[in-house]
């Protein structure tokens, strides 16, 4: 670093020649002519992790019977108290099924504890993140809506559970 009469010559030369400006300009031009890394969201969708927590769904067994055994573990573990379950009477074989299974999606914090607590993988958070509504009442999911979501997203949900299996 050379200084003449208290003036740093290197810093003065850089500021007079605008070297930072020129290097920034060339850097910007290099990125200007490359393909853009951003996505055109509504038309292009990015990759979703197998652990993504989106819209809730109730799954069925391959024979069509619903998986939920009305153990109410998901209701007990929900920190937001967004899940309400009513169990039906015991059947002849000793099993139970739900009569009512409601999730208030406005209360839900999408923590995934309900999915972790479920012993039969009945309640899952699926890959759907586009479920905006016009009214709050539409975000109150009943059993029929949850089962419809499960039927709609079963292929993607099963694939995500399979990919996540080594980490469970």
Curated annotation (Swiss-Prot):
Keywords: 4Fe-4S, Cell inner membrane, Cell membrane, Iron, Iron-sulfur, Membrane, Metal-binding, NAD, Quinone, Repeat, Translocase, Ubiquinone. [4Fe-4S] cluster 2 binds at residues 78, 108, 111, 114. Binds 2 [4Fe-4S] clusters per subunit. GO terms for cellular component: plasma membrane. Gene3D superfamilies: 3.30.70.3270. InterPro entries: 4Fe4S_Fe-S-bd, 4Fe4S_Fe_S_CS, NADH_quinone_OxRdtase_chainI. It holds the Pfam family Fer4_7. SUPFAM superfamilies: 4Fe-4S ferredoxins. Its EC number is 7.1.1.-. Residues 58-88, 99-128 form the 4Fe-4S ferredoxin-type domain. [4Fe-4S] cluster 1 binds at residues 68, 71, 74, 118. Transmembrane segments: none annotated. Belongs to the complex I 23 kDa subunit family. PANTHER family: NADH DEHYDROGENASE [UBIQUINONE] IRON-SULFUR PROTEIN 8, MITOCHONDRIAL (PTHR10849:SF20), NADH DEHYDROGENASE UBIQUINONE IRON-SULFUR PROTEIN 8, MITOCHONDRIAL (PTHR10849). NCBIfam families: NuoI (TIGR01971), PRK05888.1-4 (NF004538), PRK05888.1-5 (NF004539). NDH-1 is composed of 14 different subunits. Subunits NuoA, H, J, K, L, M, N constitute the membrane sector of the complex. NDH-1 shuttles electrons from NADH, via FMN and iron-sulfur (Fe-S) centers, to quinones in the respiratory chain. The immediate electron acceptor for the enzyme in this species is believed to be ubiquinone. Couples the redox reaction to proton translocation (for every two electrons transferred, four hydrogen ions are translocated across the cytoplasmic membrane), and thus conserves the redox energy in a proton gradient. This is NADH-quinone oxidoreductase subunit I. It comes from Bradyrhizobium diazoefficiens (strain JCM 10833 / BCRC 13528 / IAM 13628 / NBRC 14792 / USDA 110).
């Amino acid at each position: 670093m050379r200084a003449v009469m208290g003036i740093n010559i290197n810093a003065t030369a850089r500021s007079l020649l605008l070297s930072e400006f020129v290097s920034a300009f060339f850097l910007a031009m290099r990125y200007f002519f490359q393909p853009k890394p951003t996505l055109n969201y509504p038309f292009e969708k990015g990759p979703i992790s197998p652990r993504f927590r989106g819209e809730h769904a109730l799954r069925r067994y391959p024979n069509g019977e619903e998986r939920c055994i009305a153990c109410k573990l998901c209701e007990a573990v929900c920190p937001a108290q967004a899940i309400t379950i009513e169990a039906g009477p015991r059947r002849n074989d000793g099993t139970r099924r739900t009569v009512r299974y409601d999730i208030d999606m406005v209360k839900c914090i999408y923590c995934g504890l309900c999915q972790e607590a479920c012993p039969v993988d009945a309640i899952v958070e699926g890959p759907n993140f586009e479920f905006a509504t016009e009214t709050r009442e539409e975000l109150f999911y009943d059993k029929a809506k949850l089962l419809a979501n499960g039927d709609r997203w079963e292929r993607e949900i099963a694939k995500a559970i399979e990919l996540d299996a080594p980490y469970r």
